[in-house]
């Protein structure tokens, strides 16, 4: 089986490593000639994982069209803000009837579209039944190190979901399928916003009580938004909901938690982002989630305060104070 992966960041590389481990021939697309050489000649991703050895069957190319042509499956893993342009470029070169798996997370800023809505808007209808979405608690480096990991595979087409589930599932990588595309996407995107808040609390020196509070109320916000958009609330108790939220809020490898942590320590957002090697999706997702919540009339207190901090320079200590002094409420969604 030949598989093309769009995006040679940490997560695209990790998914490629799993698939190559299974014996598939995998090609990553990267814009960088240097990165492609590093993967092809030295079996390492010099930019994102310079300390880890990749499988021999994992190759890289700077030719996007060649990466998707004549493949048996395509995996899409670029930052969500780059997705629309990439799909426009490849849509006439995708082989018919191949599974298309998205691993991107986020909500497009201007249109407020979910990743699935971008795919269905940019690709012809003939491909829609082949689409699926992968999300869950999965740090890339741990996947390459073959640490046992579980994720969700969501598709509106059961046959597609089960086919992708079969292709990905391996001794250390287990997948669960669900028809709830919206729920999986909302959980995967919005947990990054909550992780920024959790990082701020850690940076300010608050304890684990505070982190647990943010995770609990954050899950409440995510579920509320998901229900408004038509998701199954039970999805948010699964890998792409609670699982991903806990990992992203607590794990030191979380880019979004790191952004919040450094903000809590007094650094500016500009300083933080300019020093990072990878995209922290939660920064852009905070803006789009805030706007989507306003549009749909969904109360999202943590998201609103993270927005004030990122886009209006509100002091992190004031953010925490505002959250703790809100009107008292009954527990529940």
From Swiss-Prot:
Catalytic activity: sn-glycerol 3-phosphate + NAD(+) = dihydroxyacetone phosphate + NADH + H(+); sn-glycerol 3-phosphate + NADP(+) = dihydroxyacetone phosphate + NADPH + H(+)
Any GO BP: glycerol-3-phosphate biosynthetic process
Record keywords: Cytoplasm, Lipid biosynthesis, Lipid metabolism, NAD, NADP, Nucleotide-binding, Oxidoreductase, Phospholipid biosynthesis, Phospholipid metabolism
Keyword hit for Repressor: no
SUPFAM superfamilies, per the entry: 6-phosphogluconate dehydrogenase C-terminal domain-like, NAD(P)-binding Rossmann-fold domains
Pfam families documented for this protein: NAD_Gly3P_dh_C, NAD_Gly3P_dh_N
Coiled-coil boundaries: none
Listed InterPro entries: 6-PGluconate_DH-like_C_sf (IPR008927), 6PGD_dom2 (IPR013328), G3P_DH_NAD-dep (IPR006168), G3P_DH_NAD-dep_C (IPR006109), G3P_DH_NAD-dep_N (IPR011128), NAD(P)-bd_dom_sf (IPR036291)
Alphabetized PANTHER family for the sequence: GLYCEROL-3-PHOSPHATE DEHYDROGENASE (PTHR11728), GLYCEROL-3-PHOSPHATE DEHYDROGENASE [NAD(+)] 2, CHLOROPLASTIC (PTHR11728:SF1)
Protein known as: Glycerol-3-phosphate dehydrogenase [NAD(P)+]
Gene name in the database record: gpsA
């Amino acid at each position: 089986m030949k598989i093309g992966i769009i995006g040679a960041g940490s997560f695209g590389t990790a998914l490629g490593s799993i698939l190559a481990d299974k014996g598939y021939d995998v090609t990553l697309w990267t814009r960088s000639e240097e990165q492609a050489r590093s993967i092809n000649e030295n079996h390492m991703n010099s930019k994102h994982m310079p300390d880890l050895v990749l499988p021999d069957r994992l190759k890289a190319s700077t030719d996007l069209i060649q990466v998707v042509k004549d493949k048996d499956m395509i995996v899409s893993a670029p930052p969500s803000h780059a997705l629309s342009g990439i799909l426009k470029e490849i849509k006439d070169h995708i082989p018919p009837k191949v599974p298309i798996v998205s691993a991107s997370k986020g909500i497009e800023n201007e249109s407020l579209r979910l990743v699935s809505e971008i795919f269905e808007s940019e690709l012809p209808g003939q491909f829609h039944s082949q689409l699926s979405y992968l999300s869950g608690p999965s740090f890339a480096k741990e996947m390459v190190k073959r640490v046992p990991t579980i994720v969700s595979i969501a598709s509106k087409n059961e046959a597609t979901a089960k086919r992708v589930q079969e292709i990905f599932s391996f001794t250390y990588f287990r997948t669960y399928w669900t028809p709830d595309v919206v729920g999986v996407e909302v959980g995967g995107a919005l947990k990054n916003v909550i992780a920024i808040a959790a990082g701020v609390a850690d940076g300010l020196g608050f304890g684990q009580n505070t982190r647990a509070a943010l995770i609990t109320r954050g899950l409440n916000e995510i579920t509320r938004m998901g229900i408004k958009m038509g998701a199954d609330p039970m999805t948010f108790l699964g890998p792409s909901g609670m699982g991903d939220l806990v990992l992203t809020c607590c794990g030191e490898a979380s880019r979004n938690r790191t952004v919040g942590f450094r903000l809590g320590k007094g650094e500016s957002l500009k300083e933080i982002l300019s020093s990072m090697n990878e995209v922290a999706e939660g920064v852009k997702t905070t803006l789009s989630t805030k706007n989507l919540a306003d549009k749909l009339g969904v109360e999202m207190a943590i998201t609103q305060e993270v927005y004030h901090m990122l886009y209006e320079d509100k002091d992190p200590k004031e953010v925490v104070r505002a959250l703790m002094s809100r009107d008292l409420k009954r527990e529940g969604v």
